[in-house]
Amino acid sequence: MTHRIYNFTAGPCTLPLAVLESAQAELLDFQGCGMSVLEISHRSKRFEAVHEETLALAQELIAAPADFQPLLLPGGAHQQFDMIPLNLLADGGSAAYINSGIWAEKALKEAQRVGDAREIWTGRDSGFTTLPDALPPLPADCRYLYLTSNETISGVQYRDYPTAAVPLVIDASSDYYTRAIPWERCAIVYGGVQKNLAPAGLALVFVRRDLIKDYPRVPKFLTYAAHAAANSLFNTPPTWQIYMLNKVLHWIKDSGGIAHFESESIAKSGLLYDYIDHSNYYQNDVPPAYRSRTNVTFRTPSPELDTRFWQEAEPQGFAGLKGHKLLGGIRASIYNAMPIAGVEALIDYMQTVAAKNA
């Protein structure tokens, strides 16, 4: 096996080694058909079986009820920023958005191009390091409350999802399949798969079936009804991403399911935060109640030392530690496939850097 390093990139994510090795073994000849999975038709019986199993596994592992339709859609999370208001506000009404960070803000701005989307709370004044402790009033005729479960850039995450008088729409991209979902409160739950589940190029979307309707004034490709009717095969799908998603879902199931990975997420992030909090060299700006378990942001005493930290990390076996360009600093993304040994190794490196620059 070639040398592997610890990949802390925010996305595309690190993938389980067992999944990569399995895909490598099948790459040239998928199930004895003499072709790669990259080459086979999305209408073939072999791929149809993969596709159907992926949808079923996705629904089973996250315990989505039967009244939710799983969809595998192109365009990642960005396309959902538009599809959600185009469908849920097609016949009027308003929507409430909690602006918890850059990703929630992007969704809000797109929704405002489509319909009456209101920002009911913003964390901008705190530098997006907090979340609302109480739910603000909702606008009249509100159809849904939109929130981003976890903000990868600033590193904030909801510990508990709010209860509202309207259903929730949750962007769960960066903590998908690391925690349970309160389905009884939801209208749509979605996420780009590139954080925890597969290579980039796909969104896994769950839509409550009673909300799947054909709206004549919405382009057909942007309706959930068209994709549901075609069983997520309305256009030629990204077969490789679906194949890899299938393998990662099997790996999640074989590893103990979401309950196992939630426990792991708490343990891994807890180790790193505990070291940062007791260090005189590193600092995290997010209050403990709002800290992300999947994207840990921190900084050293100066921007120059931040840069040196992540530049010198790669030769030591670590990738992807540079903070987002809008925030700077350092960021360690700890998704499901990151072993606890990777976090322990990172802490060892952090201790070495701190001692050297003390």
Regions found by a protein language model. Name each.
Residues 1-5, 315, 328-358:
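PLP-dependent enzyme catalytic core of the Aspartate aminotransferase-like
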Residues 4-55:
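A glycine-/small-polar-enriched, mobile loop at the entrance of the PLP active site in fold-type I
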Residues 11, 111, 123-177:
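Active-site phosphate-binding strand-loop segment of PLP-dependent enzymes
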Residues 34-83, 87, 102, 110:
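Conserved N-terminal alpha-helix of the aminotransferase class I/II PLP-enzyme fold
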Residues 78-143:
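PLP-dependent aminotransferase-like
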Residues 169, 183-194:
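Conserved active-site segment immediately N-terminal to the catalytic lysine
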Residues 193-273, 287, 356-358:
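Active-site C-terminal subdomain of aminotransferase-like
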Residues 282-313:
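Conserved PLP-binding catalytic core of the aspartate aminotransferase-like
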